Design a protein with these regions (language model features):
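Structural/interface elements that position substrates and couple domains in central-metabolism enzymes
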Residues: 1-128
């Protein structure tokens, strides 16, 4: 399954990813076999892949396993592209551009995890 990770920086308006929750969430999803579509407007692809590789190495994964997991990552230039082929969307940084998306339409076909309380619950239903 492919999961969209929206936001890599530890907070909005920065490219600083040190200790970002997105790193840990993404690595755990990769270990569980997920593929990832990642988007952040300020953190570049190299930084994202380096963050993931560093944590996987620290967890003791071999080079072969690292390569397999890194191949399951797409870093995209738009959050809409990241969402497009994902079954679940995780908002992990509170970028203002995410506020304008029509989340109510998305949740009819995908699951949404809003880790930053960015979206009013009145704007979407999670189908409980």
């Amino acid at each position: 399954k492919t999961i969209a990770i929206l936001g890599w920086a530890f907070k909005k308006n920065t490219n600083d990813s040190r200790e970002s929750a997105s790193i840990y969430v993404s690595v755990n999803l990769l270990i569980q076999g997920a593929s990832l579509n990642i988007y952040d407007p300020m953190v570049n692809k190299k930084r994202i892949l380096d963050d993931i590789e560093f944590l996987l190495k620290n967890k003791g994964f071999a080079k072969k396993d690292l390569a397999l997991m890194l191949n399951k990552i797409n870093v995209l230039k738009s959050y809409k592209d990241a969402i497009e082929k994902s079954v679940l969307v995780a908002i992990l940084t509170e970028w203002d551009e995410f506020k304008d998306y029509k989340w109510d339409q998305l949740t009819k076909t995908r699951k949404l995890f809003d880790g930053r309380n960015l979206i009013s619950s009145a704007d979407y239903s999670i189908g409980i």
